[in-house]
Amino acid sequence: MVSKLTSLQQELLSALLSSGVTKEVLIQALEELLPSPNFGVKLETLPLSPGSGADLDTKPVFHTLTNGHAKGRLSGDEGSEDGDDYDTPPILKELQALNTEEAAEQRAEVDRMLSEDPWRAAKMIKGYMQQHNIPQREVVDVTGLNQSHLSQHLNKGTPMKTQKRAALYTWYVRKQREILRQFNQTVQSSGNMTDKSSQDQLLFLFPEFSQQNQGPGQSEDACSEPTNKKMRRNRFKWGPASQQILYQAYDRQKNPSKEEREALVEECNRAECLQRGVSPSKAHGLGSNLVTEVRVYNWFANRRKEEAFRQKLAMDAYSSNQTHNLNPLLTHGSPHHQPSSSPPNKLSGVRYSQPGNNEVTSSSTISHHGNSAMVTSQSVLQQVSPASLDPGHSLLSPDSKMISVSGGGLPPVSTLTNIHSLSHHNPQQSQNLIMTPLSGVMAIAQSLNTSQAQGVPVINSVASSLAALQPVQFSQQLHSPHQQPLMQQSPGSHMAQQPFMAAVTQLQNSHMYAHKQEPPQYSHTSRFPSAMVVTDTSSINTLTSMSSSKQCPLQAW
């Protein structure tokens, strides 16, 4: 006969036999070490003797699954064990210790559920818990299962060890019988149920009094299992049927009277009974899920608080939006505009902020090829009249932003001024800006005519007195916003190289300037800051030739 042992096993057997162990002792030791048909069961927990192996096979499989003290792992659905050793829960020990007929029926029901599909049983238990508003916490407290593992098993069908499933099924069978007994009690015993409920609450608060009403055997069980006393009561939970009724009533009346609340109590209890498949006359069997007038009152109070809180949030959001709408940004610029770090009262730019009926919008674009930057500024030319210069009007507002160009920051200027010539200069030259009053423009122009034209830009600063500014009475028939802008460039004209002079020429020939009478002269107005204009040296001659004209474009500034 060919031996099925490996060489290592043969060496071990030879070593045992050579050590003096006889064959009979070795066989007896093997019989003691080999697992019996009831794998995983401690023999002292069974009423039968270890020698009656044939009788052990006839016992229900439930006894072999409820002990769980064996170190070996079972096959099948036990592979998803969460890693912790799972002691036998008290509910299984209690059911195993009972020899009554009811306990035998419960064990048979648990065995039947263990033989079925675990996912089907999990869905059945989950539906029963939802029907009777049973929280998972109650199952965890009774069975000792892990909360996360139980939730995954009921919701997703996660595999669970057979011993744990036996504890879950035991709780399910006993809970079914408990709820059935509650609803099968007669209406006359409702008072006794109330007394018993009060007694249970008292025993929950003072568990030491429970031992006085117990017998010797029950006292020992209570001492051995103290965790049963610490189990919390089930918290009241509104069912879906009751919530639907209450929300419909809340739409009709947000603060019902006591009579209306009592009517809602009866309606909710009736719906809860129908949800559980029992007669509405057995509403007392709802137990902790029984709807009372106080619970209805609290529900309506909580809904009113929630509604008031939502309204407050909506009003806060609305007022915040209104605050932003009342303070819009009046300046329009490209994303390349960089704000100045100086305070608003030190900004050198000005803009017209007085609203007017007739407005002409124009724009100027500065293209810096060296820095690949595009700066676009927009301004509004409004009708300027002696009335608009009244000190009460906010004609000028120093809230403009600085425009960043290569070589340094420049203040915003009127849109009639085009400083495109800055793109032809070096960054070092753009810093050499000349500040001069209007009276010095003639001298600068005369000196530049005799010398070679240079590329140094000139800043013409109008004197602080408005005597240098001659306001123009704009015609009432101004351009509409949909008309073309003031500054237009023709590709074939030599003025295309100098957009500033082209804009000035168009302003002179434009029909928007009517022939006006001699404008009045104004006194010293030092409260208005100086207007800034940027031009180049090649445009000085034309600018000086226009200095005596009554229609100087500076009048629009």
Curated annotation (Swiss-Prot):
Modified residues (Phosphoserine): S49, S52, S75, S80
Principal subcellular localization: nucleus
Keyword Transcription regulation recorded: yes
Tissue expression notes: Liver, kidney and intestine.
Cystine pairs: none
A GO MF label: identical protein binding
Keywords recorded for this protein, A-Z: Activator, DNA-binding, Homeobox, Nucleus, Phosphoprotein, Transcription, Transcription regulation
Domain spans labelled HNF-p1: 1-32
Residues annotated as domain POU-specific atypical: 93-188
Record bears the keyword Nuclease: no
A GO cellular-component term linked to this record: transcription regulator complex
PROSITE patterns assigned: HNF_P1, HOMEOBOX_1, HOMEOBOX_2, POU_4
Residue ranges with Polar residues bias: 354-370
DNA-binding region extent: 231-311
InterPro entries registered for this protein in UniProt: HD (IPR001356), HNF-1 (IPR039066), HNF-1_N (IPR006899), HNF-1_POU (IPR044869), HNF1_dimer_N_dom_sf (IPR023219), HNF1b_C (IPR006897), HNF_P1 (IPR044866), Homeodomain-like_sf (IPR009057)
Gene3D superfamilies (alphabetical): Homeodomain-like (1.10.10.60), lambda repressor-like DNA-binding domains (1.10.260.40)
Coiled-coil ranges per UniProt: none
Region (Dimerization): 1-31
Region (Disordered): 66-85, 324-370
Chain's role: Transcription factor that binds to the inverted palindrome 5'-GTTAATNATTAAC-3'. Binds to the FPC element in the cAMP regulatory unit of the PLAU gene. Transcriptional activity is increased by coactivator PCBD1.
PANTHER family attached to this UniProt entry: HEPATOCYTE NUCLEAR FACTOR 1, HEPATOCYTE NUCLEAR FACTOR 1-BETA
Family membership noted in the UniProt record: Belongs to the HNF1 homeobox family.
Known partners and oligomeric status: Binds DNA as a dimer. Can form homodimer or heterodimer with HNF1-alpha. Interacts (via HNF-p1 domain) with PCBD1; the interaction increases its transactivation activity.
Name of the protein in question: Hepatocyte nuclear factor 1-beta
Source organism of the structure: Rattus norvegicus
Gene that produces this protein: Hnf1b
